[in-house]
């Protein structure tokens, strides 16, 4: 009986994980295009973020609504490439009705390896990003050194930014 329950559980997990491969492929293509838009400094990058969308960057002062983020990023988008994120791994999940999608990804960036998570909603036949948070991945083995660097920086220079 235990083996039967285990087999059923494993089968159910496999079915849930691959419940909608078409949607997962569409989501991956959308997020890949979004990253490509930034890599090629295409203004369409911001069209993929919901008007009420939030972008949280790596600095603790970086929390923007879409239009604030667009204004901040304007100088970056005047170059050939604003920034380039290469996806190393992405996990995609969705609500039962497929209207809300969330994902996490591991990225190779100009800052080194970063992690990000995002929330999207369906908008007709497409999607829009409603929340995205980018974080630098700090190996646990050097975490205390990084913590000291941040503390020393804040004590010396102060943290001039504030939450938005």
Where are these regions (language model features)?
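Short, well-ordered alpha-helical segments enriched in acidic and aromatic residues
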Residues: 40-57
């Amino acid at each position: 009986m235990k083996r039967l329950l285990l087999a059923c559980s494993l089968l159910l997990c496999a079915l849930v994980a691959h419940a909608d491969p078409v949607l997962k492929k569409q989501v991956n293509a959308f997020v890949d295009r979004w990253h490509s838009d930034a890599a090629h400094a295409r203004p369409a990058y911001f069209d993929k973020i919901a008007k009420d969308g939030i972008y949280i960057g790596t600095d603790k002062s970086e929390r923007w609504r879409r239009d604030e983020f667009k204004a901040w990023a304007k100088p970056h988008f005047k170059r050939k490439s604003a920034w380039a994120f290469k996806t190393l791994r992405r996990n995609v999940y969705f609500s039962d009705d497929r209207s809300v999608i969330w994902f996490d990804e591991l990225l190779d960036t100009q800052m080194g390896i970063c992690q990000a998570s995002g929330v999207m909603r369906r908008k007709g036949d497409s999607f829009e990003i409603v929340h995205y948070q980018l974080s630098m991945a700090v190996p646990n083995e050097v975490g205390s050194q990084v913590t000291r660097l941040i503390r020393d920086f804040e004590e010396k220079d102060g943290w001039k930014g504030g939450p938005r």
